[in-house]
Amino acid sequence: ICDCSFFGPHCIICEINGAHGQGHRHSLTSIHRAGTPFSTIHFYEHTMQAWSEGKTLHLGAEAEVISGTWFGRPAVLKKRRPRGWRHPDLDSSLTKKRMTNEIKLTIWLARRGAPVPAIWDVDIQEAKIIMERIDGKPLIEILRNNEHDEELLINVGKAIRELHRNAVNHGDLSTNNILIDKERKPILIDLGLSSREYDLEGFGIDLHVLHEILRASHPEVKGAMDLVLKGYVALDEELGKPQPAP
């Protein structure tokens, strides 16, 4: 997944004695958004100083999400929280693995135009990711406030199918991990448990998990999963049979 030749001789994403290991980090915005040549990528020392912190948006068992700005742009900082019940070495190893997985797949999907947020900065050692802030609400909130319609749920299905067409299983497809932006476009977040493989069983598990959540947490939304599946199937009808992802 990680194109080391794109990042130069030492890649911070696969961490092969890279810039990150030397205490440096760099902006990923121009890399995965515009494909900036390596020679024009500016490396920053301690770029987390460019982060201006706001309020905490979410404090969960796995991570804390904080709003703020990054070089003046609306952003969020996601910081993985240590799990006290796990051995520190095991916890550190699992956190690093999941963060690296999330970073790799999110950047790879963003390059292909999939509905995921842009990642702007990472710090593996401190378990931090800075990414663009999506101005919107999680699907769970939209459904609870009865702010949904048929078109929205159909578009959720299309977003999920777009992920699967790129041979990525989400791994934790809950209504908390689907954001709806101001234009009513679904954005898929939190890919720490995702995997890249064109696996029909994995796709089915994603859909089954979402179905169970909709049925248990949102029983008042009648036919929700039917609409999601309608959108899921419709995307293939619009775009044709998916081609193998390179």
Predicted regions and their residues:
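Conserved kinase catalytic-core helix
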Residues: 108-112, 140-176, 181, 207, ...
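Regulatory N- and C-terminal appendages and interdomain linkers associated
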Residues: 44-59, 72, 155, 183, ...
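The N-lobe alphaC helix and its flanking beta3-alphaC-beta4 segment of protein kinase-like domains
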Residues: 92-108, 112
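ATP-binding glycine-rich loop module of kinase domains
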Residues: 54-56, 61-99
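Conserved structural core of kinase catalytic domains
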Residues: 117-153
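C-lobe/activation-segment region of protein kinase-like
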Residues: 187, 191-246
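Cysteine-centered motifs
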Residues: 2-4, 11-14
